[in-house]
UniProtKB/Swiss-Prot annotation:
Name of this chain's protein: ABC transporter A family member 7
Region (Disordered): 571-591
Record domain ABC transporter: where: 613-850
Protein species of origin: Arabidopsis thaliana
CDD domains named in the record: ABC_subfamily_A
Length: 935
């Protein structure tokens, strides 16, 4: 098959996308259960809503007031009459009101004990309730302002019972009772407290009784005179200062000095009327899930307008503000949307539940080393990030769309009343932030269980903290708004705040029979701040996640982005000069290793690519920890492997083989030295190296739910195989490792035996004809027949490929490897083909004999007679092994000596063997360890 060349960005992205879709297809029921979570929650909210409506609407306090007009003998009411006249102020809202009452316009004034007394001699007026009502004035023209302020109040208190509203309108009436959220019943009139008549001058405790009737309602009220005090201030800043310091927390003494109202006449003159009005907005009581109360601002506007008209036209001119009136209404019931009341908590949990799913998926690929194995087979960071991000975003968007559709379908006002476009934009922005955070946080965790526990703590903790902490502080008008914004920097709180705002608008809209949040309301809520916070955090989290991923996955310097991208590495095409004296002295004892090193130096100076792998003085030192010295894992390795050669690495555990493979595959950064793979430097061009590389790791890195065929299709696409070539390569690979017949190819890898998984890992490493393949103990766990078959596959694959494999099987090394290198303590002790090594280190026969213990001396005498220079190498329980130099023995003489010995003592077993590769390995390892200890 022709070389397909490196895969493009789109090809690799397509491969990952197909793999992800197949993977999710295998996990279909898990995805369905995930999507059903919002369905279950919405149904739960509907059930709670039904139970709530049934319970609440049966309460007498939540319906129009009634009076019993007929009782039976037992005293039980048989007939009742309901209406506004029988209702308490709280019940009036529920009554049918075809002709709403007319109410005199009242000015909101402070309670007597809270009025401003800073300009008085003392505060004794508070004990008698006679403190004046203070109103502040300012503007550009003090003379005009003084005249206007003098026209503010009247002295008329005459009453005409036939025209009571007009009579009251000619006076400036005030009340200390806050308004309700409707004007069907004015609490200022309905309460038992006095109505105040604000006049320029008052007789102490002067009162005027009057009767106010609006059928079917009738009230006997008392009009109490109170003095109005108009004070001039030079600037609006002084007005703000006086108002703020009159607030209990605005002065160190904690005193209350409330101002009723304030006016800034600005540039008002005879041709221009321009005024700013201050009022106490806390009377709106707009914190929490309740309707905003009305505030008595209209009378303030009318007063200053009348005062200006009288300034222009004289005291006989005025705009009479006769009454305020609500719109007619039918009888209503209490409409409380439970989804809006508890929705912020529930929907915070619903949306955040995606976070553990995304995080677990990312950490799983990290824990199982699937991310790095994909990267080793050519999947770069760009396609991985783009497809993974787009995939998670698609799943998340479908999730919230299902939530919105189902919530709307079952009638939840939270979704129906608020603008769908606002909801979608809010969810979309937050989902992007949540995905970016998952990528960022995934770099912290290495275990799925740990990440899952931590993420669910985050999910439920965020919802509960939002309900009991953030919700409380939002509704606390004294808590600084700036600190609320700071708290919303925590992503869980920004989500909760956005849902809180949507819930508030839906709740009020449901009570009023209006819409919830629309784009025109955007500036009147905290949603603009939430949007800004989410967008900025999304951008920052995405950059931070990508940056940390680059550092952690490639071992780059944290300041890698400051390096000159056009600066060539000094290691390219130049041999390393970091040769230590100890290395030179060792190489003098190993001519084969020295020859390899010189060969590497020559290749580094040439432009030839005949050798697929060239390692130049590659070294890895692990830093010391806990007081231990640094660990030298690889001691300046120089090695050249041409295309078409299989190079085997032998060595005891801890010799440095794995560290070397990890450096070559990009898992570790070399401490010094470098290596070229197809002419590309592993220190600077690892992403390009991956496109021509195959890896069979020591442990099988597979997706348990994907089949063997799907694994090979994925990795084949990463190697730029397409169409018929891809299918042919996959089938050939499956057949070569005996995973094709009997439907095995289409079984999930999780159902494979250990040997089948191993064969699949080898097939993955070889698909697409990579130029370089690293195999770490490829035949581990295979039965003899499968092992022989696998060796044949590897031997056939090496024709156009450079293969480096590690193994503990001498048989495997001898069958597969063209050359062998034996590693001891991080250094290469010898290098050559198996026959050369056996010839070089195996100039002796191995004689073995087993007898009873009392005849051990006889065996030693026998060997000394045959070979005076023989050396005992093994002795245990009557079994002894000797090395016999080939130059001083003949095989026939050994046989004759043994036959003669059998007549003198009993021989249980004996044998004579030529030197094996295992004997060479043991000898080299022992010599190498002894030399390193001596050094």
């Amino acid at each position: 098959m022709a070389d397909p060349g490196p895969a493009s960005f789109s090809t690799r992205a397509n491969a990952l996308l197909r793999k992800n879709l197949t993977y999710q297809k295998r996990n279909l029921w898990s995805n369905i259960r995930l999507i059903m979570i919002p369905f279950y929650l919405c149904i739960l909210l509907v059930i709670i809503q039904i139970l709530f409506d049934t319970q609440v609407n049966n309460s007498a306090d939540n319906r129009c007031g009634c009076e019993c007009i007929e009782r039976n003998r037992a005293g039980k009411c048989q007939r009742e009459l309901c209406g506004l006249e029988h209702s308490k102020p709280d019940q009036a809202f529920f009554c049918s009101i075809p002709r709403p009452p007319l109410w005199p316009p009242l000015l909101q004034i402070p309670r007597p004990e809270s009025r401003d007394v800073r300009g008085l001699r003392d505060d004794s007026c508070r004990r008698t309730g006679s403190c004046p009502v203070t109103i502040l004035f300012t503007g550009n023209n003090r003379s005009l302002g003084t005249t206007v302020s003098e026209n503010l109040f009247t002295s008329s208190v005459s009453a005409n019972a036939s025209e009571i509203l007009r009579t009251l309108a000619n006076n400036v009436l005030g009340t200390t009772v806050e308004a309700d959220f409707t004007n069907y019943l004015d609490p200022g009139i309905a309460s038992n407290l006095s109505i105040y008549n604000i006049q320029p001058r008052c007789i102490l405790n002067a009162t005027f009784p009057f009767s106010f009737e609006q059928p079917p309602l009738k009230f006997e009220k008392e009009l109490r005179c109170v003095q109005g005090s108009n004070l001039w201030t030079n600037t609006s800043k002084e007005v703000n200062d006086k108002i703020f310091k009159g607030y209990k927390k605005g002065n160190p003494e904690g005193k209350i000095n409330e101002i009723a109202a304030a006016y800034d006449l600005l540039n008002t003159d005879r041709n221009n009327f321009n005024v700013h009005i201050w009022y106490n907005s806390t009377y709106k009581d707009d914190a929490g899930n309740r309707l905003i109360k009305l505030i008595r601002v209209p009378r303030s506007v009318n007063l200053v307008s009348n005062a200006y008209l009288q300034f222009l036209q004289g005291p006989g001119t005025r705009m009479l503000f006769e009454y305020v009136k609500e719109m007619p209404k039918p009888e209503t019931s209490l409409r409380l949307d439970i989804a809006s009341l508890i929705g912020p908590l529930f929907f915070t949990w619903v949306i955040l539940l995606l976070f553990p799913v995304i995080l677990s998926s990312l950490v799983y690929e990290k824990q199982q080393h699937l991310r790095i194995i994909m990267k080793m087979h050519g999947l770069g960071d760009g396609p991985y990030w783009m497809i993974s991000y787009a995939y998670f975003l698609t799943i998340s968007v479908l999730y919230v769309i299902c939530l919105m559709i189902f919530g709307s379908a079952i009638g939840l006002k939270f979704f129906r009343l608020n603008s769908y476009s606002i909801q979608f934009v809010f969810y979309f922005l937050y989902l992007n932030l949540q995905i970016a955070l998952a990528f960022l946080v995934s770099s912290v965790f290495s275990k799925v269980k740990t990440s899952t526990v931590a993420s669910y703590i985050y999910v439920f903790g965020s919802g509960l903290l939002g309900l009991f902490l953030l919700n409380f502080l939002i509704e606390d008008s004294s808590f600084p708004r700036g600190w609320i914004i700071v708290m919303e920097l925590y992503p869980g709180f920004s989500l909760y705040r956005g849902l809180y705002e949507l819930a508030q608008f839906a709740f009020r809209g449901n009570l009023r029979g209006e819409d919830g949040m629309k784009w025109k309301d955007f500036g009147d809520s905290a949603m603009d701040d939430v949007f800004y916070i989410i967008v900025v955090e999304w951008f920052l989290a995405l950059i931070a996640a990508y940056y940390i991923d680059k550092i952690s996955s490639s071992g780059r310097n944290p300041l890698f982005f400051l390096q000159n991208p056009f600066k060539k590495s000094p290691s390219l095409r130049r041999p390393s000069l970091q040769r230590q004296g100890s290395k030179v002295s060792v190489d003098m004892e190993k001519p084969d290793v020295t020859h390899e090193s010189k060969k590497v130096e020559r290749l580094m100076l040439e432009s030839s690519t005949s050798h697929a792998i060239v390692c130049d003085n590659l070294k890895k030192v692990y830093p010391g920890r806990d007081g231990n010295p640094p660990k030298l894992a690889v001691r300046g390795l120089s090695l050249a492997v041409p295309s078409g050669e299989c190079f085997g690495m032998l060595g005891p555990n801890g010799a440095g083989k794995t560290s070397f493979i990890n450096m070559m595959t990009g898992l570790l950064k070399p401490t010094s030295g470098t290596a070229l793979v197809q002419g590309l430097d592993i220190c600077n061009d690892m992403d390009r190296v991956y496109t021509s590389m195959g890896v069979c790791p020591q442990h099988d890195l597979l997706w348990e739910t994907l089949t063997g065929r799907e694994h090979l299709l994925f990795y084949g696409r990463l190697k730029n195989l397409k169409g018929a070539d891809l299918n042919q390569a996959v089938e050939e690979s499956l057949k070569s490792v005996n995973l094709f017949h009997g439907g095995v190819a289409d079984k999930p890898a999780g159902k494979y035996s250990g040997g089948m998984k191993r064969r699949l890992s080898v097939a993955i490493s070889l698909i697409g004809n990579p130029k370089v393949v690293y195999m770490d103990e490829p035949s581990t766990g295979l039965d003899p027949a499968s092992r022989k078959n696998l060796w044949t596959v590897i031997k056939r694959a090496k024709q156009n490929t450079a293969i480096i494999l590690t193994t503990h099987s001498m048989e495997e090394a001898e069958f597969l490897c063209d050359r062998l290198g034996i590693f001891v303590d991080g250094g290469l002790q010898c290098i050559g083909n198996p026959k050369e090594l056996k010839g070089r280190y195996g100039g002796s026969y191995v004689f073995t004999m087993t007898t009873s213990s009392e005849h051990e001396q006889n065996v030693e005498k026998l060997i000394k007679d045959v070979s005076p220079n023989a050396k005992k190498i093994y002795h245990i329980a009557g079994t002894q092994k000797f090395e016999l130099p080939k130059e001083e023995v003949r095989i026939s003489e050994v046989f004759q000596a043994v036959e003669k010995a059998k007549s003198n003592f009993t021989v249980f077993a004996w044998g004579l063997a030529d030197t094996t590769l295992e004997d060479v390995f043991i000898k080299v390892v022992r010599n190498g360890q002894a030399f390193n200890v001596f050094s």
